[in-house]
Amino acid sequence: AIFDSCVRYLDEDPWERLRELKKAMPKTKQQMLLRGQNLVGYKHYSDEIVSKFIEKSVLNGIDIFRIFDALNDLRNIKHSVDIVKKNGKHAQGTMAYTISPVHTVQTWVDLAKEIEDLDCDSLCIKDMSGILSPEFAYDLISKLKKEISIPIHLHTHATTGMSNLTNMRAVEAGVDNIDTSISSMSMGLSLIHI
């Protein structure tokens, strides 16, 4: 949404914004969310466009690419992962968390193994709607820590009011990183505060 907001609403160049941030914080790794073959847009793009966009992102200062497909179809993230790795940057394979009768702990573990097999540098559990329960998070992360070797990140929104406890249980299970926000921009639809 950053690229879309810059162009559509602010009449700004998103690349210029990125360069300014990198200049102001040269030692801070810059991260972006990449929707696999959708990049930062709302349709699928060709492999050539995906490659050029990632190369341009690297050139302008992105270090870590959090790559996902909304339907967890890894065919839609594979090319992005390959190009990020080819450019010497961090590819974070991401699972878009949801709840259904088929989404068991083992379903998520199997998907995480496939993500690790893509040569991702880390895994992110992306709970964009805040529906990951504390106990499911504990069970899932405990099992993932036994089954995969790459670092595990948790991104969960405060939408449902469970995220504080969910993050606490994730830490108890051994998660490597949790995403947080500064207090003035936290909670509600955002992340928990530091």
What are these regions (language model features)?
Residues 1, 28-35, 65-66, 91-95, ...:
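Hydrophobic faces of well-ordered beta-strands that scaffold small-molecule active sites
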Residues 34-49, 68-70, 95-107, 153-161:
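Active-site mouth loops of central-metabolism enzymes
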Residues 192-194:
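Conserved small/polar residues in nucleotide/adenosyl-binding loops
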